[in-house]
Amino acid sequence: MPTIQQLIRNARQPIENRKKSPALRGCPQRRGVCARVYTITPKKPNSALRKVARVRLTSGFEITAYIPGIDHNLQEHSVVLVRGGRVKDLPGVRYHIVRGTLDAAEVKDRQQGRSKYGVKKQK
């Protein structure tokens, strides 16, 4: 514990909150261009080939973003919209690509949870 004299000399520093999605720079979403589209494997105990993209954002950051849903049409130079939200079993993946906007097509034949995958209501 510091003495009063030490506190007078050097005041206590407030603890700074760490942002969970710093690359968005306080915006709800950011536009970016895919630099690379590939698959990675999740950490234990899960097993899969998860689709991710390396995205260069308009804020200047290059991030790894998860591509949600079954099948996708993304390739290098695709323009995508990125939102925050991590993927628990993929270390370093702290962003999601928004489906159904810009170059990311919506998920085909999706009936439930459509809003998360950019699918319009069926007539």
Swiss-Prot record:
Q: Choose any GO biological process term that the UniProt entry carries and state it.
A: translation
Cite a single GO MF annotation: rRNA binding
Localization annotation: Plastid, Chloroplast
Q: Which InterPro entries match?
A: NA-bd_OB-fold, Ribosomal_uS12, Ribosomal_uS12_bac
Give the top-rank taxon of the lineage listed in the UniProt record for this protein: Eukaryota
Q: Name one GO cellular component term.
A: small ribosomal subunit
Q: Which PROSITE patterns match?
A: RIBOSOMAL_S12 (PS00055)
Keywords associated with the record: Chloroplast, Plastid, Ribonucleoprotein, Ribosomal protein, RNA-binding, rRNA-binding
What family does the Swiss-Prot or TrEMBL record give for this protein? Belongs to the universal ribosomal protein uS12 family.
Indicate the quaternary assembly: Part of the 30S ribosomal subunit.
Q: What is this protein called?
A: Small ribosomal subunit protein uS12c
